[in-house]
Amino acid sequence: MAVTEQDTQVPTLRKIVTSESEPLARRFRALFSLKHLASLQPPTEQTVPAIEAIAAAFSSPSALLKHELAYCLGQSGHDAAIAPLRGVLEDKDEDSMCRHEAAEALGALSDKGSLELLKKMRDDANEVDVVRETCDIAVDRIEWEHGLQKGTEKLKKSDFTSVDPAPPMPESNEAPSIPALEKTLLDTTLPLFQRYRAMFALRDLSSPPDLPTAVPAVHALARGFGDPSALFRHEIAFVFGQLSHPASIPSLTEALSNTKEASMVRHEAAEALGSLGDEEGVEETLKKFLNDPEQVVRDSVIVALDMAEFEKNGEVEYAIVPQAQAIAA
């Protein structure tokens, strides 16, 4: 039987994403190609091999790559991703940024079977903050997903296809109030899950960028960079990366430039700026951090500059075109 292009697709991408000799930017493009194949609905015969290929790259020393692997597995919507994600979360020797992303991914998969593990880590006083906080949000998300509340809430249709750590605030009969959402966003006495709901509601009011609510909502989100939680600040940067709104550039630049800021926040700010690569001055800003003392920031800048190049070239998808010949080139 002849080997088809489809048969060689996942193995070729797996070889790239797991190879330490491949440039990081190329490995990321291979990863996003695998994410596409892993997330196809309905699943295909490539779904599980693509998930296994993504999980195989957890042996990499790159914290940036591993955290992105976990994110992509969480977006797959497939139970085959659960076991490798639990393995990363339970590995106390793993980078906390990767473990946090694994916990968030289990929440995105709405895996009830992981609730016991997530609750145990949420309640462990010796666990690092970023993992504890993520487990807290993931538990609330899974319980919301499987609870009665979800069915009774009216949610605004989002422009974004991502499976988020929390749904946006439910719609009411009144017009959404940016000051009210900002108040919830910044209230540290509220559960993180509730504050994240305000965050994603503000995100959805920022897109498309010409909405009259967009700039005020972006400015409200930017005030979240003053929060005491590094996890929360990093999620603000992630949302800005999704939005690619020019009004976020000053706060993202400030976050990246602050060498006292947590590396998980700075790296996310760098990647968000990469999505704004066609805006004036952004590439120059990123290039200043190519030799940053923090490896995850350096790596993020490399990927961000590759993304910026992609934005300028008007390429359709930040991925290697999933065709065997193109991949092997």
Curated annotation (Swiss-Prot):
Residues that bind Fe cation 2: H234, E235, H267, E268
Cofactor: Fe(2+)
A Pfam family the protein falls into: HEAT_2
Pathway noted in the entry: Protein modification; eIF5A hypusination
Binding site for Fe cation 1: H67, E68, H100, E101
Keyword tags: Cytoplasm, Hypusine biosynthesis, Iron, Metal-binding, Monooxygenase, Nucleus, Oxidoreductase, Repeat
SUPFAM superfamilies, per database record: ARM repeat
Record's subcellular location: Cytoplasm; Nucleus
HEAT-like PBS-type repeats mapped onto the chain: 65-91, 99-124, 232-258, 265-292
Annotated TM spans: none
Annotated GO CC locations: cytoplasm; nucleus
Molecular function in Gene Ontology: deoxyhypusine monooxygenase activity; metal ion binding
Superkingdom assignment: Eukaryota
Reactions catalysed according to its record: [eIF5A protein]-deoxyhypusine + AH2 + O2 = [eIF5A protein]-hypusine + A + H2O
EC number(s) stated in the UniProt entry for this protein: 1.14.99.29
Protein family according to the UniProt entry: Belongs to the deoxyhypusine hydroxylase family.
Function in brief: Catalyzes the hydroxylation of the N(6)-(4-aminobutyl)-L-lysine intermediate to form hypusine, an essential post-translational modification only found in mature eIF-5A factor.
HAMAP family in alphabetical order: Deoxyhypusine_hydroxylase (MF_03101)
Protein's name in the database: Deoxyhypusine hydroxylase
Native source organism of the sequence: Phaeosphaeria nodorum (strain SN15 / ATCC MYA-4574 / FGSC 10173)
Primary gene name: LIA1
